Amino acid sequence: MPPLIALSPETSQALADRQPLVALESTIITHGMPYPQNLEVAQQVEAAVREEGAVPATIAVMGGRIRVGLDAEALEALASTPAEQVMKLSRADLAACLALGRTGATTVAATMICAHLAGIEVFATGGIGGVHRGAETSFDISADLQELAQSPVTVVAAGAKAILDLPKTLEVLETLGVPVIAFGQDQLPAFWSRESGLAAPLRMDDPAQIAASARLRRELGLSGGQLVVNPIPPEAEIPRAEMIPVVEQALSEAEAQGIAAKAVTPFLLQRIFELTQGRSLDANIALVLNNARLAARIAAAMAT
């Protein structure tokens, strides 16, 4: 194990015993919602993984090391740290955060890197980043997509966030050779909504099939991971027809106010929260829990 990796006793034991493990990101804790709700949701997500027979390993940079698996005290400390004091880490700034001794929350890309270093093959998140609308002029494309082509981790998400350009995101993933596997349906889900209007490139209905695909990719010497897109539970979704005008309104307001670059996503998510009267956050929590359960089932299939 690299010396920069600090495994929790539970994570270390799970790796030694070849128990199923699921990596969890920390950006949702530090930048996703306020304290103490963020702590409660993090605990619920970990509990969902355990209910399906796997061990959760939340990942963050704390005290100059990559912590893989946070105990109750560390989780509380991270959740209660103001967001402005926490670096939001991707591939580009992971090493810098460690060098500076800062606290850092891992995005999808950084979590994949850290999970792979620790020997964890499955990771559950809410949604991945992707190609932003207007990327043909801004070139704003999330590092998550490139990471999926590099780090051999199976990522379970509810699709890319619906504020993004989903057709272009799918095209980039195809170009990068990333398998996009819809779980249990033919359409690509769109985060808050079960349907996006786009056909998924691949479909699988059994976690064992997804685990087998990961193993065969390794045997074939193929680099990168897999993206498993898991639709939000029907009772929690905000239907696509309802979300389209909400997203369009938030996007037009962002453009009118000249909001650009890294400020765009937080602005859009906050406006969507307001326009849906909080339903978008409720849906977000439901889909993360759903993804954690599926990831645990995939991890269990990989461990057999």
Swiss-Prot record:
The entry sums up its family as follows: Belongs to the pseudouridine-5'-phosphate glycosidase family.
Q: Which GO terms describe its cellular component?
A: cytoplasm
Complexes and interactors: Homotrimer.
Using the UniProt record, name the top-level EC class of this enzyme in a single word.
lyase
**How is this protein named in the record?**
Pseudouridine-5'-phosphate glycosidase
The superkingdom of the source organism is Bacteria
Write out the catalytic residues in the record.
E25 (proton donor), K161 (nucleophile)
Q: Which residues bind Mn(2+)?
A: D140
Tell me what gene encodes this.
Answer: psuG
Matching Pfam families, A to Z? Answer: Indigoidine_A
Record carries keyword Oxidoreductase = no
Cell division as a keyword? no
Q: Which GO terms describe its biological process?
A: nucleobase catabolic process
**Which HAMAP family would you find in this protein's record?**
PsiMP_glycosidase
Q: Which cofactor does it need?
A: Mn(2+)
- Report the InterPro entries cross-referenced here: Indigdn_synthA-like, PsuG
Co-factor remark: Binds 1 Mn(2+) ion per subunit.
> What catalytic activity does the UniProt entry give for this protein?
D-ribose 5-phosphate + uracil = psi-UMP + H2O
Q: Name one GO molecular function term.
A: pseudouridylate synthase activity
Q: Where is coiled-coil annotated?
A: none
EC numbers listed for it are: 4.2.1.70
